[in-house]
Amino acid sequence: MKKKLAIIGAGIAGLTLANLLKKNSNHEFMVYEREESLSLEEGYGIQLATNSIKILNQISFDKINNEKIFHPKTIEFYNIQNEKICDLNLSKFNSNEAKYTTLQRSTLIEFLKEDIYTQHLRFGKKMKEVSELKDKVLIKFDDNTNDLVDFVIAADGIFSNTRSFFEKKKNEPRFKKAIAARVILKSKSEFDINEENISLMLGSNSHIVLYPINKKKELNMVC
């Protein structure tokens, strides 16, 4: 039986599910995003393990522009003095169809929105009320629109507004007094590392991660 789904959140999880539904089912669905647009500016890098690549390949991720991604073969571990400790061979987990991949988040979002943007994505939709109505869920948004659906999928992140409408016990993220700073290095770094690999530098209360995000060898650095 055909069902109607509301996906709340147009991030990686929400857009991936939307693409899978469009390709593999006849269910009706809509992605609702509270922001007014998708952020497609050059942003931070992300790493995709082979399990996630297998899922993305079901929606033709293997056809993405190869210049915009990278396949590091090794994770190298260093101490904070840049002395190598050990390494992990990532290529052992690869197959011909699915390889460990690094790229910018915006590159992945650009790919995921391609088949969804026009018909299945609505912006400026912040949920304000949820109620049950004859085995269905009535969603009301703060722009005075609504939708009646069979299922609601919360994909709006760790600060999820959606989750608060369904959880009996309220849970909130806890600040662990740790922060992450991210930057893209577009020129050769001053670190003594192999810039085709993932480098993890370990300190007593901190660490630095560097890895290439495209064939131009631009590096994502997190510290």
PLM region descriptions:
Residues M1-A13:
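Beta1/beta-strand and adjacent pyrophosphate-binding region of the FAD-binding site
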Residues K54, S187-N194, K216:
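Short helix-loop capping/hinge motifs at secondary-structure junctions, enriched
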Residues E196-C223:
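Active-site substrate-recognition segment that forms the wall
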Residues K3, H27, V137, E195-E196:
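Nucleotide donor/acceptor-binding cores
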